[in-house]
């Protein structure tokens, strides 16, 4: 993956004038591409859209504690997603499960969370198939994973 970003930037929005200001130093993470907050707002989950997090060509998902006063992020842990180029992360309504879509290879994975930190991967489901455009649809590509309203 060719991305070069090294962090997650936290900005403060001023509704009075519509301006954005840096609120905290960037959280360090290689090529973050999608983030989501836990339902209680205390943990930020972010995917690292890479294909070399481990020796198996996996991307990564990180859990970061959010300081609600300053916006600063503190790294809790990182887990391999089981597929390359994770592009989406979501949390169920109860805040217990974190789910990731891996674009390359078309897989989705789930993790439990305890106090914000991610467990080892609970499940990994690989989709198969290809699309009609062989130039860009040579394999399945997961774009997102979203839990239903009743989890």
Where are these regions (language model features)?
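Residue position within the beta-strands of beta-propeller blades
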Residues: 1-2, 46-47, 100
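An edge-strand/N-cap motif at the start of beta-rich repeat modules
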Residues: 1-11
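Structural signal for beta-propeller blades
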Residues: 8, 52-54, 59-61, 106-109
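Short loop/turn segments immediately following beta-strands, especially the blade-tip
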Residues: 11-18, 64-71, 110-119
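Glycine/small-residue-rich interface belts in oligomeric ring/scaffold proteins
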Residues: 25-36, 44-48
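Residue-level detector of Asp-centered blade-edge/turn motifs that repeat once per structural unit
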Residues: 39-41, 91-95, 149-150
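Asp-box/WD-like beta-propeller blade repeats and closely related beta-sheet repeat scaffolds
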Residues: 72-144
């Amino acid at each position: 993956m060719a991305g070069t970003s090294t962090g997650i930037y936290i900005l403060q929005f001023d509704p009075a004038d519509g301006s954005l200001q840096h609120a905290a130093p960037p959280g360090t993470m290689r090529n973050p591409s999608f983030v989501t907050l836990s339902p209680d707002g205390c943990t930020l989950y972010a995917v690292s859209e890479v294909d070399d997090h481990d020796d198996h060509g996996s991307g990564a998902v990180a859990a970061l504690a959010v300081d609600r006063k300053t916006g600063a992020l503190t790294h809790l842990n990182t887990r391999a997603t089981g597929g390359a180029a994770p592009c989406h992360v979501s949390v169920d309504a109860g805040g217990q499960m974190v789910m990731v879509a891996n674009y390359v290879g078309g897989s989705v994975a789930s993790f439990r969370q305890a106090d914000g930190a991610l467990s080892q991967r609970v499940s990994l489901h690989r989709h198969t198939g290809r699309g009609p455009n062989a130039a860009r649809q040579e394999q399945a590509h997961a774009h997102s994973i979203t839990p239903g309203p009743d989890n």
